[in-house]
Amino acid sequence: MTEPPAVDRPLRRVAMISLHTSPLDQPGTGDAGGMNVYVVELSRRLADLGIAVDIFTRATSSALPAKVELVPGVTVRNVAAGPYEGLSKNELPAQLCTFARAVLRAEAIREPGYYDVIHSHYWLSGQVGLLARDRWAVPLVHTMHTMAKVKNASLADDDVPEPPARLLGEEQVVEAADRLLANTDEEAHELVTLYGAQPAKVEVVNPGVDLEVFAPGDQAAARRAVGVREDAIVLAFVGRIQPLKAPDLLIRAAARMLERQPELRDRLVVAVIGGPSGNGMEHPEAHAELARRLGVDDVTRFVKPMPRPGLADWYRAASVVCVPSYSESFGLVALEAQACGTPVVAAAVGGLTTAVTDGVTGLLVPGHGVDDFADALAAIATDPGTRETMGKAAVEHAQGFGWELTAQTTLAAYRTATETMAAE
């Protein structure tokens, strides 16, 4: 076993573990979402601070090289573990041993003490992190991103509960990790009350937003770029197409708005931007059928996920961005939209209550009632004065969530974990 790191040795390298989703994947497709953005942006900012980062992820194609330089100082290591394609997230636990063995081999060829800290993301990665922690004798810092007990307590009608294996796996990681990073105060509270985490091990580190990419701009130009008329009322959803994210609620709320104000039809655009979760169909047929059944298929667009500059255009083009999720550990979409100067209507759940300031940068809706969301969307989208006031406040609010601060706070947590282990 490697000797524990000396307390006065500077941090040099981090082993970042993101087993089930690659930082190279396009967010909004498959299982790629906010966690992908988090891992990429945090790693980039850590590299800016002089910390080298290796990101270990499961290879999903034989064509992928063993390693890819994301940016100078950040290397993605594609680990072969199980079939390259066709595995759902629920089938990945069977590949944990194979993946962990490959991660341990990667360190074994290095000089002793090559990595100073392990940072795992999501419970599957946490299980691998536990094995690496014991072998390498370096601290394990873990970020949950989502928690099964929280998700199971607020399932959408057509969603399925998380399996017992995940519940047990999360409990094991929470108990053994040296440091637990929570996105918000609420998540920190849930770690303590639902999982029995030691409060002293839990630290709140807010995610960030890329304030260079997601910034205010000319709405008319943005609308030309995405192909909507300048006087349109644009309601946008951004994210994976899955019950948890509830894009159907936006479609239903838009239909309700048109029932009440049919004169809006000529100007209304409902943009659902994202792809099906997991190995779903390329086109979200069920949601397209819902739009047809509700009579709003003529105003509804399904837009494939896209790189960030194009996404920023959609945020700027939108009158309001809707985030109706049943559960969110934070809600990066809400923050990105606000950084672009667009108010947000969101469900009053989880981290969205931190990401959105109710009544100031947008509206938080208790529950998931169609009428309530229709009311909130109409209150902002059809009132230019409200949109302008909230949009300005949204930009100011988002300025406090840069990734640079996230990286600095995370690095401090790494140092605390390292010093604590060295002192034991």
UniProtKB/Swiss-Prot annotation:
A GO BP entry: mycothiol biosynthetic process
**What protein name is recorded for this chain?**
D-inositol 3-phosphate glycosyltransferase
Class of this enzyme: transferase
Q: What does the record give as EC number? A: 2.4.1.250
InterPro entries documented for this protein = Glyco_trans_1, Glyco_trans_4-like_N, Glycosyltransferase_grp1, Mycothiol_biosynthesis_MshA
Name its species: Kribbella flavida (strain DSM 17836 / JCM 10339 / NBRC 14399)
Q: How does it assemble?
A: Homodimer.
The cross-references to PANTHER family, in alphabetical order and at most eight, read: SULFOQUINOVOSYL TRANSFERASE SQD2
A Pfam family cross-referenced in the UniProt record is: Glycos_transf_1
